[in-house]
Curated annotation (Swiss-Prot):
PANTHER family: GLUTAMYL-TRNA(GLN) AMIDOTRANSFERASE SUBUNIT A (PTHR11895:SF151), TRANSAMIDASE (PTHR11895). Gene3D superfamilies: Amidase signature (AS) domain. Keywords: ATP-binding, Ligase, Nucleotide-binding, Protein biosynthesis. It comes from Dichelobacter nodosus (strain VCS1703A). Its EC number is 6.3.5.7. This is Glutamyl-tRNA(Gln) amidotransferase subunit A.
Amino acid sequence: MSDLHHKTVAELATLLHNKTLSSVELTQHFLSRIQQYNPKLNAYICTTADRALADAKASDERRQKGAAHSPLDGIPMGHKDLFCTKGIATTAGSKMLERFIPSYTATVVARLEAAGSVLTGKLSMDEFAMGSSNERSYFGAVYNPWDEQRIPGGSSGGSAAAVAARLIPYATGSDTGGSVRQPAAYCGITGIKPTYGTCSRWGMIAYASSLDQAGVLAKTAQDCALILNEMAGHDPKDSTSNPKALTQFDHELNRDLDGITIGLPSNYLAGLDAKIAEKLQQTAALYEKLGATIKEITLSATDVAIASYYLISSAEASSNLERFDGVHYGYRCANPKDLSDLYERSRSEGFGAEVKRRIMIGTYALSAGYYDAYYEQARRGRRAILNSFLQAFKECDVILGPTTPTTAYPLGSKVDDPVAMFLGDLYTVSANLAGLPALSHPAGFIDGLPVGCQLIGAHFSEPQLLNLAHRFQQETDFHQQIPEHYR
């Protein structure tokens, strides 16, 4: 079958289950697409073709014995390159970890391996997940398959570009301030960040520990639900893992929307690009047609979200990245004169400009003379944002808004303007600060570029968000569109 890349994870699972298709055939199809198209996209940092074919062969053998591990068994995928993979380089997109080969496997990776996933390789990302455009990778920029002169979003840009171009059916990502949802929106696919603590952070290279959360990028909400079924759940090895974390995400798919109230924040519309606002209103109208009630609400504290997010995340990054000093592991400068020179040059040469910028911001915010004025103020802003959401959820079940303020912008257009880059996360960072689940789904196109809309729910409401997006996708075909040169 030559159209296998058009199919969803759910459809591929059915073909494999019915033995209409073998995993080896499926894997060869996607490896061929990776070989053909990745040079145009630069989505992969490394590929693992031999490993993938071995995984696929093992999957076929299990299925012949009636012992498939899960619906995902035998389906190719890719991991964002900050999930540790034993024996396979894990770089976090940085020169600092260019030669780092982990001796252990991240819990998220291990759970998907146990489900029978077929690993095709490690996907590019902004260095240490610090970026919104995937121009900050040591291994070069990733290109948006809808327009290769534009960014795919970040920091999970490799994951988003690979799924959008149909190089793989799904990929993992991580989301600290929008790094799953924003690239999903720019690339015309579905991406979900679960409630903080739902997916284990063990073996995931840290950016900001109180904000980081593993997520999923796929064509559809149904696919995201099937994948989360396998990768989510409490992990005793991760102190931030929540014992209440859900392990079943597809049980509400196809439920009626009657009785569900969707809040539309009026302050999200102020200053929003008119064409994006039109897509948002059209999305709200379809949800209303499907039975939901649309109610205008106000989120009172979101004006401090960007400042609070960048201070907190930079402060945590400055602490997390202290370990990369040229002594323990990671990049080490050549011929250091003394220990001080070793530290200074290893970090100066090993980290890129954006990572060094955020380390400096974080170190400054945590310094004794400025802690109260900056970091503590940001923490108060974070609490206000959570309280604003909790108040909003007394009026509605789910909040609908834009995922991004614009469509994907040209490569290089904001790389020298960090404030403009930061503002691209305007609608996504609040969910991370509050630890809430949030999902972006395709909502149409503007001048040939995808637009995403975002659903934010109360803690552990992922099944409801996934059902809403699933019902929307049953009525639309935005998620089925493929960039012209990748069909």
